[in-house]
Amino acid sequence: MSEPIHTHQDSVEIAAPPEVVYGLVTSMERYGEWSSENCGGYWRKDASGTPGSGGVGDQFVGINRRAGREWKAPVEIIEREPDRRFAFVTGGTDANIALWCYTLEPSGSGTRLTESYELRNLPPLLQEGGQPAVDDRMDAMRTSIRATLEGIKTCAESDG
């Protein structure tokens, strides 16, 4: 794999145990409650017609809105370590557009939650828009990560 095009991470201290925070982080259908961009989504069904539930290999389709535009962002779960780590890749492992990772560490006050983002490959819209489009997208990611962390914190500290 080549070096990421862009990376960003941010953290928040949450006055709740890791198992509570992990339960929220892995509830992707709830991200619309916290994100400044995501407004919901759904688990894709497997060959038998059963929707995913967040296991490694399951796929979720996030519905995002920003600046008057709406789009779907399919992701594939690539790592799930209870109460410690949860990661997924936008576009699935084939397209490998962006890696999103949540790391949980026990802390004196409860849990330190870190959300990290790696832009690995440019999707067509960012390729067409050049560096200004990439810069705009990275600004949006920083805002979205902060909003998501604060939203999860508020939810976890108010008993989910």
Roles of regions detected by a PLM:
Residues 43-96, 107-112, 147-160:
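Glycine-rich portal/gate segments that line the openings of hydrophobic small-molecule binding cavities
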Residues 1-3, 46-47, 72-74, 120-125:
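Short hydrophobic/aromatic-rich motifs at helix boundaries and adjacent loops
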Residues 1-50:
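Hydrophobic ligand-binding cavity/cleft-lining segments
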Residues 89-147, 152:
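Beta-strand/loop substructures that line and gate deep hydrophobic ligand-binding cavities in soluble
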Residues 11-15, 76, 103:
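Generic structural detector for well-ordered beta-strands
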Residues 14, 64, 117-119:
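Hydrophobic beta-strand positions in extracellular immunoglobulin-like domains
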